[in-house]
Amino acid sequence: MGNWDNPEGFMLGTQSGFGLFEPGKYAPMGRMDRGRSMDQILRETCGTKYAEEFWKRWRRLYLTEEDIALLSRRGYNSVRLPIRAGSFLYEEPGITYNEDSFAMLNDVLDWCETYQVYAVVDFHAATAGQSGIPCDDGVDNGQHLYDDEESMERMFLLMEEFMRRYKDRWIIGAYDCINEPISMTPRREELTPKLVYFYEKMIRRCRKIDQKHLFLLNGTQFSSLTYFFDHEFDPEYHNWGISLHAYEMVVPEVASLASVLRTCREQKICLWMGETGGRNEHAWQTTMYEILAEYHAGYNLWCWKTVEGAGCASILNFNVPDEWHLITDYAINGAAKPSYEHAQAIWDSYLECLAVDKCKENTQYHPYLLREGDFEIPAIGYNALPMDSHRGLSDLPNATGYRLYDRFELVYEKGYHPEPAGFAAPGPIKHPRDHVQLQLGAGEYASYTIREKETYTVSVTYCADKEVKVQAAIQGETLFEGVMPPAGEKVTSDVHPYFAYETAPNTLERFTLGTVTGEGILKIEVLDGCARFGQIVIRKSEK
């Protein structure tokens, strides 16, 4: 639920501010790249009294009961609630808590209980800033939490207050601590031991109050480096895990997760993908998330609601008011400031855009995230587990560099030539896996999990020079056994449907294997001949 209590510029329709923190160079916060600077612009354009009341309205309008109800209806069972310390603990001498913020959170937790949606309370923006990037709501791009003894103590006190208030709230599934610490900084090696100290002391102090709830600890560098979780962080209760973040830059295969999965096994702890997404990355999403599910790791899409064009996989999008540019032009480009009255009207209009019924729902994500309804699975996105769910017989690693250990022939489609750097090509993120096919010969097979509970058809797209004998089964029950005819491959120069700087995948023939009711694991095996498969196509709409 990004933007709700911890706004970020790129999700607001302003600026991202994700600039590199260069060694020895001070990097102040942007004019409107985080909640702290958004508050400053509010005070400049609308006045202090308006700004103070605005935040109460913002938090209650950005996340409403209807948001939680819709989230539940769509099949999701948890919501991550990113909070900023400054919303709950006033930034002034002494310890004074913002009771309105706690009242607001209490309402959200009540809705979560009503709709059976677990809440993961995410300490996204710690006191003084822990990340060095705008999402930590710091005053600049430093990581002052680790250097400032008072700020660290205030963070401990705030977390202890959460434990006191919510130790008996069963709907809280976990505490996510602390978001993306020590990212984009040359001080990572220096600060990592201080982060370890913070985690160890945090858990010791919190456990004196709350012995029940799970703590999910983030690695450094955008929650991706987890090597320092090499010992027990919760020695008395052993109720902790790792929160990992991964987007489409990460190759969707077990090898990408091997290090953290091994750590989790060694420490006997759980893994949770606390942030993931990838705008229009349906093939990536349905492949990566199934791998996570197979290894019993939950995942959380970033994020639920953002401004249109934010560039992340949000379920809901809202449009900014027509005159929003007057605020951003003033804040970022130095244009004339609207009058107080005019600016207040613009901000009021912004609040009106946040309601669920004013948003556009991006329903295309649901089928790929949940594997229900109408969706496609890339043939190369076959199940990783159990180990006998797939069998390749090649004596050479495939030439694409993807899933090298499975002994399958993965081949580029006709006419496609990847850039020299392959999957790590410079510039805009390329999608060579969209142009890779799974070649199956006699005795080879692959499996795919389908979670649609009603009736649907199963098809494949493929090409084959000659007839190929295939058997397809779901949960051991034969769906199809017979001959698929020769099929061609139409080379295309069309623009990719999602990525304007790439060509679309080639067109393959589609062959319907049959109709089935209920979820299960689809196994496709070639009995004789050879075929190259592009997609597994599931259509509830064609039953």
Task: Annotate each PLM feature.
Residues 80, 176, 300, 383, ...:
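Residues embedded in well-ordered beta-strands within globular domains across many folds
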Residues 83, 179, 246, 303-306, ...:
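Residues that line or immediately flank small-molecule/substrate-binding pockets and catalytic motifs
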Residues 354-543:
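Extracytoplasmic
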